[in-house]
Amino acid sequence: MTEQAVRTYVLDTSVLLSDPWACTRFAEHEVVVPLVVISELEAKRHHHELGWFARQALRMFDDMRLEHGRLDQPVPVGTQGGTLHVELNHSDPSVLPAGFRNDSNDARILTVAANLAAEGKHVTLVSKDIPLRVKAGAVGLAADEYHAQDVVVSGWTGMTEMDVAGEDIDTLFADGEIDLAEARDLPCHTGIRLLGGTSHALGRVNAAKKVQLVRGDREVFGLRGRSAEQRVALDLLLDESVGIVSLGGKAGTGKSALALCAGLEAVLERRTQRKVVVFRPLYAVGGQDLGYLPGSESEKMGPWAQAVFDTLEGLASPAVLDEVLSRGMLEVLPLTHIRGRSLHDSFVIVDEAQSLERNVLLTVLSRLGAGSRVVLTHDVAQRDNLRVGRHDGVAAVIEKLKGHPLFAHVTLQRSERSPIAALVTEMLEEISPGALP
């Protein structure tokens, strides 16, 4: 292979925190890790969400050190002739415009990449951090997001339509399920609008690959589905065999209301779980971190927890809410509390899951103990974590789990909020896709 064909990829810390073994995934190319990245990984070793990934990345570097003796010179990685080294030099800031010559870690990473490019190398800065990629573009460096863990997002909504004979719909209503050849290839738990001339029905594919009837009169804690998607979602939430339910959709489509009602139904009425635990990520609109807000932890959590209580106030009476809280049947916690816990006999709701990186989301799912279920609510158009793209995080988890009998996903379509809220949400959706990665 020619020297010109080999590219040089400079990795920042965000890449290694998302995939500790990222250095081994660049085929025959040269991977460069600036020294400041090692320092940033060290600083993240005890982070509540990212600490494990930082330690794994550092352990990988240490294993390479033990094998090769030193890392300041290229050492072989992978099976396709790629190399890796920790860059100690190329720290002359004069290659950058004056405005970028500072002591920030971003500036140090940019300096390494710019110096390597000045030597004639084909350099690409790889980062999951949007601001750093923008800065790289501002100084004329090629930059890209880390794609090795991306999945091809199919746009699967968990719903489909199917034309069938009127007799098939009659059979479905009479027997509660029907074996349809056209439905056997659909992912498990896909909702189906069955159209049979003048008659129609709603069903979903069960684990046996048969279509079972979804009743329109089912309710959870007094809440009934208004749309086909909501009715399928309710049916899935009431099915104890489905351990992970994903509810997507724009703001106001009823994701949180359905999840909370299903949780209260499970705890108070059906008693299949002991308590409802709601985890919310610590990202506000604008990305403000919880630690910068004044007050104790409970006071800091107030605004985050209040969003859950606002939803509950529209669904249950004050007396019911008081009973749930006084008996410890409802907890609203920051996601920092998940690591180290095993959640047994709990109905777990991960709210705003679109702001979670895939590794963090998998950590959450790994905490589930015996008798627990989890509901993920998310809207990928409202990501507050700049390290999460449209093709990773919860979107990647959905694509990986799609079709498994323990997993179901539904994208809710119809807004249940005021006409004003629906209008504004629609406008934001029209504006944002071109601007978002």
Swiss-Prot record:
Pfam families: PhoH (PF02562), PIN_4 (PF13638). It catalyses: n ATP + n H2O + wound RNA = n ADP + n phosphate + unwound RNA; ATP + H2O = ADP + phosphate + H(+); GTP + H2O = GDP + phosphate + H(+). Induction: Part of the phoAT-phoH2 operon. Gene3D superfamilies: 5'-nuclease, P-loop containing nucleotide triphosphate hydrolases. Its cofactor is Mg(2+). GO terms for molecular function: ATP binding; GTP binding; isomerase activity; metal ion binding; nuclease activity. CDD domains: PIN_VapC_PhoHL-ATPase. Disruption phenotype: Knockdown of expression using antisense RNA decreases the growth rate about 10% in liquid media. Deletion of the phoAT-phoH2 genes has no visible growth phenotype in liquid media. Its EC number is 3.1.-.-, 5.6.2.5. InterPro entries: P-loop_NTPase, PhoH, PhoH2-like, PIN-like_dom_sf, PIN_dom. Residues 7-134 form the PINc domain. It comes from the Bacteria. Changing residue 339 to A: No longer unwinds or cleaves 5'-tailed RNA, decreased ATPase activity. Keywords: ATP-binding, GTP-binding, Hydrolase, Isomerase, Magnesium, Metal-binding, Nuclease, Nucleotide-binding, Toxin-antitoxin system. In the N-terminal section; belongs to the PINc/VapC protein family. Toxic component of a type II toxin-antitoxin (TA) system. The possible cognate antitoxin is PhoAT; the toxin gene can be expressed in the absence of the antitoxin gene in an endogenous mc(2)155 double deletion. Unwinds and/or cleaves 5'-tailed RNA in vitro that starts with 5'-AC, the reaction requires hydrolyzable ATP; double-stranded (ds)RNA and dsDNA are not unwound or cleaved. Has ATPase and GTPase activities. Interacts with antitoxin PhoAT. This is Protein PhoH2. The gene is phoH2.
